Amino acid sequence: MPFIENQTTTAEPIVPVDVKGKDAFHKLVDDLSAVLGPSSGLDSDDVDPKDIQKLMEGYVSNHEEWQRYALADESRAYTRNLVDEGNGKSNLLILVWNPGKSSPIHDHANAHCVMKILHGSLKEHRYDWPEQDKINNGEACPLTVTKETILRENEVAYMSDKLGLHKISNPDPNDFAISLHLYTPPNAAHFGCSLFDEKTGKSHHIKQCTFFSNRGLKL
C-alpha cells in the first residue's frame, strides 16, 4: 500500500477526477485550505474544528488518490509526510504506521489535530495531563489513561491539548496503517512539541517535528 523507501514506480496511477480535473482527495485538500482562510492570521481559537471534521468525514478513502504521498520507512515506527501547508495556516500530513508500532505519548503544541484513517486501523490511548506541582517537586506522577479508542478506515477523530495527551498505535502486527492529519496552527513543525514518560509523567521537548517527505518527494 505505501511507497517503501527506494521503491520506484513506472507510471502514475489512474484516478477518478471531478469536473474541475481534481480527484476527491485533492479537492479535500483545497477545501481544507479554504476553511482556514486565504491570508488572515490564525491561532487555535479562530478555528472551528467541526468544520474540518465535516470535510474529512465526507471523503471516502481511495488509495490511488493519496498513495503518492504515503512514503514508508521500515526502520522507524512511522513517517510524517507533508501533503499541504494550507496557505501557511496548517500542516496536512499523511502518516504511515509500520505494523505493531506506536507514537510516544505527546501533546499538540496548542494546536488542533483532526485525524482520518485512510487504511487499516489505529488505537488511541488518551491521558490526563500530569500534576505539575508533583513534577516540579521531583515526584513521579504516572499518567492516567482516560480513554481507549479503535479508529477504523474512514473514521475521524479530534484532539487538542484541552483534551489531554495521547498516544497512537497500529495494532495490526502484519499490515501498515495510514492516516491523514491536519494540524492548525502548525506549531509542532515550527516550535516542536513535548513527549511524556508514562511511568513518571516527566516530559522533554523536541525542537522540531520533522517531515519524511514533502509532497511526495523524500527529504
Swiss-Prot record:
- Which key words tag this protein in UniProt? Dioxygenase, Iron, Metal-binding, Oxidoreductase, Thioether bond, Virulence
Say where the cross-link 3'-(S-cysteinyl)-tyrosine (Cys-Tyr) occurs. Answer: 113-183
Q: Does the keyword Hydrolase apply?
A: no
**Catalyses which reaction(s):** L-cysteine + O2 = 3-sulfino-L-alanine + H(+)
InterPro entries of this UniProt entry?
Answer: CDO_1 (IPR010300), RmlC-like_jellyroll (IPR014710), RmlC_Cupin_sf (IPR011051)
- Enumerate the Gene Ontology biological process terms: L-cysteine catabolic process
Q: Does the keyword Metal-binding apply?
A: yes
Q: List the molecular function annotations (GO) for this entry.
A: cysteine dioxygenase activity; ferrous iron binding
Please give the superkingdom of this protein's source.
Eukaryota
| Cofactor notes | Binds 1 Fe cation per subunit.
Q: Name the EC number(s).
A: 1.13.11.20
Cofactor(s) needed for function: Fe cation
User: What does the record say about PTM?
Assistant: The thioether cross-link between Cys-113 and Tyr-183 plays a structural role through stabilizing the Fe(2+) ion, and prevents the production of highly damaging free hydroxyl radicals by holding the oxygen radical via hydroxyl hydrogen.
* Ligand binding (Fe cation): 106, 108, 166
- Function recorded in the entry: Cysteine dioxygenase involved in sulfite formation from cysteine. Required for keratin degradation and plays an important role in filamentous growth and virulence.
Q: Its family? A: Belongs to the cysteine dioxygenase family.
Q: What is this protein called?
A: Cysteine dioxygenase
> Which species is listed as the source?
Arthroderma benhamiae (strain ATCC MYA-4681 / CBS 112371)
